[in-house]
C-alpha cells in the first residue's frame, strides 16, 4: 500500500499566507510574493500558522514535487521577512569599467575597451545598487535576484580567451539572506 507524503511548514511571525485558486501569496514586512503552484496529486493547505503540502501518492514525481513546493514556499517566506542579497565585485586590469543602473537595465561601459556598452536585464522587483567596484543585487524573490546576478556575471564573460589570464569581469562573491 502506498504511503502518504506530507510536509508541514510553519509560518513565521509577521507573515500572512493565503492560497486561493492555486496561487500562494506570502506578505510580510518587505513586501508580497506570489506564485502559481499546481501539480496533479499534490495538495496545499493553509491551516492557521502552518502550511501543509501533501500527496496521497508516494510516486517519485509526487514526492519530488512535494519537496520542491516546500522549498519554494520557505524561500517565499524568507524573502518577505529578510530578503535576498547578492554581492558582486567588479574586476579589471587595464580598462576601467563604468557601471550604472538605467531603469530596468544594468549598463556596463568600456569593458575591455569596447566602444559598445553591454546591457543586462534586471528581473522583477529586484533592485541593483552600483557603487565603485561593488554591485549589490537585492530583492524578495530568490529566483529573480539570483537570475539578475547571473545575467550581470554572464554579460562580462570573455569568450575565446583563457579565463586564468583575462580575469576582467563582474563576479558574485557573496550571497546573503
UniProtKB/Swiss-Prot annotation:
One of its GO terms (cellular component) is cytosolic large ribosomal subunit. SUPFAM superfamilies: Ribosomal protein L6. It comes from the Archaea. The keyword Membrane does not apply. GO terms for molecular function: rRNA binding; structural constituent of ribosome. Signal peptide: none annotated. Coiled coil: none annotated. InterPro entries: Ribosomal_uL6-like, Ribosomal_uL6-like_a/b-dom_sf, Ribosomal_uL6_a/b-dom, Ribosomal_uL6_arc, Ribosomal_uL6_CS2. Keywords: Ribonucleoprotein, Ribosomal protein, RNA-binding, rRNA-binding. GO terms for biological process: cytoplasmic translation. Belongs to the universal ribosomal protein uL6 family. HAMAP family: Ribosomal_uL6_A. Part of the 50S ribosomal subunit. This protein binds to the 23S rRNA, and is important in its secondary structure. It is located near the subunit interface in the base of the L7/L12 stalk, and near the tRNA binding site of the peptidyltransferase center. This is Large ribosomal subunit protein uL6. It comes from Methanococcoides burtonii (strain DSM 6242 / NBRC 107633 / OCM 468 / ACE-M).
